[in-house]
Amino acid sequence: MSHLQNLLLDTLLGTKHVDGAALIKLQEKTLCVTSPGFSVMPCDVRTLLNGFAKNPLLTRREGLYFREKDYKCVRADDCSLYAKKENTGVVVVKTHMYLLVATYTAGMYPSVCVEATEKLGEYLRKKGN
């Protein structure tokens, strides 16, 4: 298991409020690592990258289609995308080298998912990643 996968497992899934997580390489526009059982298709990678490429207002207005679900975007800026659908959601944090993706499901606290994902994103930024 890689250092990056261990980071995902320990800091995100370890909270018990993140269902799945992934790191996407910005430069290559490819999936780098995921948590076990969490799949991100190439079309989902493009969707997330486009969410940051657009004007944040447009992303908030249009929402986000991720893993075959339409999500309402509740936050979109240069560093973060938050989207939800009923009692599930996706949190995406941009660093220098990666998009960090985390999802939550029913029974999980979205605020814990957001906090853990943002903290890991900040850690990666400080490390130059």
UniProtKB/Swiss-Prot annotation:
Statement: the UniProt record of this protein carries the keyword Repressor: no
Pfam families linked to this entry: Profilin
A biological-process GO annotation: sperm flagellum assembly
Cellular compartments per GO CC: cell cortex
Family matches, as CDD domains: PROF
Ribonucleoprotein recorded as keyword: no
UniProt tissue specificity: Expressed in testis, in seminiferous tubules (at protein level). Expressed in spermatocytes and spermatids, but not in spermatogonium.
Tree of life domain: Eukaryota
InterPro entries recorded: PFN (IPR048278), PFN_euk (IPR005455), PFN_sf (IPR036140)
Record GO terms (molecular function): actin monomer binding; lipid binding
Gene3D superfamilies: Dynein light chain 2a, cytoplasmic (3.30.450.30)
Assigned keywords, A-Z: Cytoplasm, Developmental protein, Differentiation, Lipid-binding, Spermatogenesis
Localization per record: Cytoplasm
Record function comment: Involved in male fertility. Required for manchette development and acrosome biogenesis during spermiogenesis. Binds in vitro to phospholipids, including phosphatidylinositol 3-phosphate (PtdIns(3)P), phosphatidylinositol 4,5-bisphosphate (PtdIns(4,5)P2), phosphatidylinositol 4-phosphate (PtdIns(4)P) and phosphatidic acid (PA). Contrary to other profilin family members, does not bind to actin in vitro.
PANTHER family for the chain: PROFILIN, PROFILIN-4
Entry similarity comment: Belongs to the profilin family.
Name this polypeptide is given: Profilin-4
Organism field: Rattus norvegicus (Rat)
Gene symbol of the encoding locus: Pfn4
